[in-house]
Amino acid sequence: MKKPLGKIVASTALLISVAFSSSIASAAEEAKEKYLIGFNEQEAVSEFVEQVEANDEVAILSEEEEVEIELLHEFETIPVLSVELSPEDVDALELDPAISYIEEDAEVTTMAQSVPWGISRVQAPAAHNRGLTGSGVKVAVLDTGISTHPDLNIRGGASFVPGEPSTQDGNGHGTHVAGTIAALNNSIGVLGVAPSAELYAVKVLGASGSGSVSSIAQGLEWAGNNGMHVANLSLGSPSPSATLEQAVNSATSRGVLVVAASGNSGAGSISYPARYANAMAVGATDQNNNRASFSQYGAGLDIVAPGVNVQSTYPGSTYASLNGTSMATPHVAGAAALVKQKNPSWSNVQIRNHLKNTATSLGSTNLYGSGLVNAEAATR
């Protein structure tokens, strides 16, 4: 759906006998929450929306019950609707055989920790000396936006954060991530892993540093629709989402390499979406090549990169040092851009496997995955 949908009321063909004592007026006043409704197939989504619109704001589940829904977004490439409805109505809707799941549109946050190097450690300058700087490679930064900065060349983007139409960064996190990927090779500031890569600011997190699954899924959809080669997701949630997994899978099927932060709780399992099979999960290391104490690890961890005291661009044409797997992830996204420039015909899967195969082993795969990303070895 290419434009926002107004407030409407959904109906289903099911006849459900559920006691319903509230009036229509009181039902309309019930507090609604955001949900994601997954359907078994795309055609079912269209039929559901058509039925809703034809029902003229009256959803009749049975003689006793009506359900009011506000449609927020219909995804183009996955069979999912973003909606608002009363939690009390979820169980009734889930009985529709066309609906495969209904899940909360959960909050997702940045993976930065506190106020905190790594380009030389991943040996990016050696690749630069070979003429590999990420030229012609499109990298989408799904984050808090990217602020205008003399050390960054932002080529475009889009915002999927309600109430924040600008892609400018009101938080700082996204600007910092962008600099690690592609800070310019000029006379000022810092140097990125892929200084000639094309940066796209895809705003999916608000100024508070948090956002929703639906915003991130829309950002991934945008990345697929706009020919992005790499998508950096320095964000995550402890909770799985079927919608987010579908969005990752869809973007991957359209050629996007999805690179995501493993998480900052220090736990022995990684966060979502990094845990999904089609996302490249990145953990963080310190200056001694040890796992950063906060870096989540475990099954599914693909690779690690510097994530402690990482200096990069920041809003206000300034620079800052930050810690987090959020800071590690863009090192890998930048390295992917270098590999893509050298091997333009390679698929996202080939690039991912090559980065893992050329990483510097640091020990246990449980703690470090394939090892420390090595831009020099990856671009030989």
Swiss-Prot record:
Single GO BP term: proteolysis
UniProt remark on cofactor binding: Binds 2 calcium ions per subunit.
Cellular component terms (Gene Ontology): extracellular region
A GO molecular-function descriptor: serine-type endopeptidase activity
Transferase in keyword set: no
Enzyme active site: 143 (charge relay system), 173 (charge relay system), 326 (charge relay system)
Subcellular location as annotated: Secreted
Name of this protein: Alkaline protease
Organism from which the protein derives: Shouchella clausii (Alkalihalobacillus clausii)
Lineage: Bacteria, Bacillati, Bacillota, Bacilli, Bacillales
